[in-house]
Every structure is written in C-alpha cells, then in structure tokens.
Amino acid sequence: MFTLKKSLLVLFFLGTINLSLCEEERSADEEERRDEPNEMDVDVEKRFLPALIGIAAKALPSLLCKITKKC
C-alpha cells in the first residue's frame, strides 16, 4: 500500500511539472501570436500595393488621354 501511494505521489508530481511546462510554452506562443498581426498587416500590404499599382498603370494612359485630349 505504501509503494502504491509513493508511486501515485511521484506520478502526481511529474504531472504537475508537465502541466507547468505546458503553460510556459502556451504563454510563449501567446506572446508570438501578439506579434503576428503586424506581420499579417505587412503581408496584406504587400498583396494590396502591387494590385493597386497595376490598376493605376492600366488607367493612367486613358486618363492622360482624356485630360490632354491628344488621343
């Protein structure tokens, strides 16, 4: 009976250590996630700006033609 209690106590102790390590990893992951939205904004800007430049490049000649009336 004593060995059973002792082994259960050891398992409980090891389990609490594992849980505390998992919580530390979670908090580190949460800190990394806080940084990710900024990176996502940069990715969105990288995707948005080339599309905007492409649209402007297509529309600019016709706009200049209409303004200067030299078509």
UniProtKB/Swiss-Prot annotation:
Disulfide bonds join C65-C71. Expressed by the skin glands. It is found in: Secreted. It holds the Pfam family Antimicrobial_1. It comes from the Eukaryota. GO terms for biological process: defense response to Gram-negative bacterium; defense response to Gram-positive bacterium; hemolysis in another organism. One of its GO terms (cellular component) is extracellular region. Keywords: Amphibian defense peptide, Antibiotic, Antimicrobial, Cleavage on pair of basic residues, Disulfide bond, Secreted, Signal. Belongs to the frog skin active peptide (FSAP) family. Brevinin subfamily. This is Brevinin-1P. It comes from Pelophylax fukienensis.
